[in-house]
């Protein structure tokens, strides 16, 4: 069947089973938007900024495991999208981002809204394409979805000149891809896995170190089963929250710069670190030469470039994590494992001696209390998104996560402004469920993409934004207090809008909360009304995120809270 290049794009998305697209139109992509107008195979959400379009597609992808899709125009439309691309690239989120480009006859002439989009996207995408002829559109989009979702996932950028979207050719959508140089290693090396299993059997203090790859490979429940069958304790990175279920007695906590005392001590004292889809990020390891320095290391990852990049493993295994962990489970009966009970009990003692806690108050709301109370009120009914800052760490520490993909945050890039558009994408993914999409944010972060409240209202996307409002850029203020002799340079945010009036101006529901009773009432009311909402929680200004491993220190060299009795 013959059709325009623009219709090919829309038809290809339909062929890939796309249900929701986020985007913002403009001149170079207008032909594609004309075809979107004519179709009813997928829904299009009009964001109010291209960065939000990409991040909303991320939120959708993180919540569902599907490939998110966003469409933007050329020039500033694309440059606005770059932060979202970089965020998805750092966290390995599968996206296909389609951008318009100036006509091929104008490329290279500094035409209106021309930018070298593929040159810009090269370092922040898994792969990118500039479409040179209309016949390539079906193949390229098919390849883009395949590349984005296989191996180590990531964003793929497809740049299409406007004249190519106007041309007409035969549409033939390929049934499969032919990429001879792209063959991700899925199946593990059996010999290496046997060596790793022997190492586990002989270890005295093994530890599962679970990273974001466990979410991406959908093997959270297999990892729980592995931990429980072998009685091995587990720690999670920021990106892996929810894998183990916080109530699991083998869960020792989140590790890293703001990890739990017991989790960080577990990594420091283990004699066998079993890395499952983790990449040894600097915010996790602390001083690298001291990280798990007493341990042999098993590193399982689908990306061979991640292995030995920072820590040289004794047992490197390249392969799909879900397939590999299933094989580990199936082979358990072939080995005699040590009894790890004493090790498990030692780590439980650590958690009891130095639990996560804060000094509560009857006179003001502590931000940690707000997160903890939110967890008590919503528990597993909510999918939690966050922005970046102190509130992000408190959310990771104090919200009780119980299943994979319950947590949506910007880890690698640390993108302020991530929370609201990501929570929108999550909410679209949750439309047919009874789950609630909640964005835990700060008074700094929320203003970075505040315009998306309009999008939420227009499409009735019921995101509940909980602002932990301390009138500071809180994490920067904390570092200035701890490491810069309290020189608070440009971190005071006392001059802020009235957030209740602001959300009401956008057409949403607003609440201002200064007592614990008001907090409970606001959360319950927002959940019941199922409308876009913003809860401005006035919290104590000078709280710090603790524990904290200062830069250049080992994980066992934590700054801990003095006092406090609330776990």
Question: Model features per residue range: what roles?
Answer:
Residues 135, 294-390, 516-517, 523-525, ...:
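Phosphate/pyrophosphate-binding active-site segments
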Residues 24-26, 45-55, 70-77, 132-133, ...:
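Active-site nucleophile and cofactor-binding loops and adjacent substrate-binding regions
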Residues 68-70, 158, 384, 407, ...:
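Well-ordered beta-strand positions enriched in small/hydrophobic/aromatic, beta-favoring residues
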Residues 6-9, 14, 18-19, 32-36, ...:
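Active-site diphosphate/adenylate-binding microenvironment
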Residues 1-335, 373, 377-380, 434-436, ...:
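N-terminal alpha/beta PP-like core and its mobile active-site loop of ThDP/TPP-dependent enzymes
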Residues 52, 116, 218, 365-369, ...:
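A generic structural signal for residues located within well-ordered alpha-helices
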Residues 227, 267, 367, 449, ...:
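Active-site-proximal structural scaffolding
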Residues 98, 106-113, 308-310, 316-318, ...:
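Thiamine diphosphate
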């Amino acid at each position: 069947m013959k059709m325009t290049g623009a219709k090919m794009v829309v038809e290809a998305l339909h062929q890939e089973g796309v249900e929701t697209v986020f985007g913002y139109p403009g001149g170079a992509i207008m032909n594609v938007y004309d075809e979107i107008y004519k179709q009813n195979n997928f829904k299009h959400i009009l964001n109010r900024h291209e960065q939000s379009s990409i991040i909303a597609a991320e939120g959708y992808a993180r919540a569902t495991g599907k490939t998110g899709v966003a469409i933007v125009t050329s020039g500033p439309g694309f440059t606005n999208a770059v932060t979202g691309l970089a965020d998805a690239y750092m966290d390995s989120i599968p996206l296909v981002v389609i951008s318009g480009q100036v006509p091929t006859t104008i490329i290279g002439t500094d035409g209106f809204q021309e930018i070298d989009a593929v040159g810009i996207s090269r370092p922040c995408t898994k792969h990118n394409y500039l479409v040179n002829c209309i016949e390539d559109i079906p193949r390229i989009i098919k390849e883009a979805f395949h590349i984005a979702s296989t191996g180590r996932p990531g964003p793929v950028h497809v740049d299409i000149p406007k004249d190519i979207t106007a041309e007409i050719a035969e549409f033939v959508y390929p049934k499969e891809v032919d990429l001879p140089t792209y063959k991700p290693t899925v199946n593990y090396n059996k010999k290496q896995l046997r060596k790793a299993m022997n190492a586990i059997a002989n270890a005295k203090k093994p530890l599962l170190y679970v990273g974001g790859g466990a979410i991406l490979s959908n093997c959270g429940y297999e990892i729980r089963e592995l931990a429980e069958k072998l009685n091995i304790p587990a720690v999670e990175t920021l990106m892996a929250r929810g894998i183990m279920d916080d109530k699991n007695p083998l869960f020792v906590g989140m590790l890293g710069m703001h990890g739990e005392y017991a989790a960080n001590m577990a990594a420091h004292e283990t004699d066998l670190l079993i890395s499952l889809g983790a990449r040894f990020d600097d915010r996790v390891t602390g001083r690298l030469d001291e990280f798990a320095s007493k341990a042999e290391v098993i590193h399982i990852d689908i990306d061979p470039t991640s292995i030995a990049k920072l820590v040289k493993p004794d047992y490197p295994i390249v392969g799909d994590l879900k397939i590999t962990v299933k094989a580990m489970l199936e082979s358990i009966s072939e080995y005699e494992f040590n009894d790890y009970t004493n090790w498990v009990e030692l780590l439980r003692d650590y958690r009891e001696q130095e639990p996560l806690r804060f000094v509560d108050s009857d006179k003001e709301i502590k931000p940690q209390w707000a997160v903890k109370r939110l967890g008590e009120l919503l528990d597993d009914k909510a999918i939690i998104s966050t922005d970046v800052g102190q509130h992000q760490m408190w959310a990771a520490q104090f919200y009780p996560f119980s299943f994979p993909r319950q947590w949506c945050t910007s880890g690698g890039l640390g993108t302020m402004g991530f929370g609201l558009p990501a929570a929108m994408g999550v909410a679209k993914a949750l439309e047919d469920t009874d789950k609630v999409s909640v964005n835990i944010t700060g008074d700094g972060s929320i203003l970075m993409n505040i315009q998306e409240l309009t999008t939420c209202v227009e499409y009735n996307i019921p995101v509940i934004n909980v602002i932990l409002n301390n009138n500071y850029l809180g994490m920067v203020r904390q570092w200035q207090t701890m490491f810069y002799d309290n020189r608070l340079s440009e971190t005071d945010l006392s001059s802020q809008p009235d957030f209740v009036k602001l959300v009401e101006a956008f057409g949403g529901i607003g609440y201002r909360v200064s007592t614990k009773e008001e907090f409970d009432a606001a959360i319950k009311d927002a959940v019941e009304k199922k409308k876009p909402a913003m809860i401005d929680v006035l919290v104590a200004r000078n709280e710090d995120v603790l524990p904290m491993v200062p830069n250049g220190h080992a994980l066992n060299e934590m700054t801990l809270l003095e006092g406090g009795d609330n776990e």
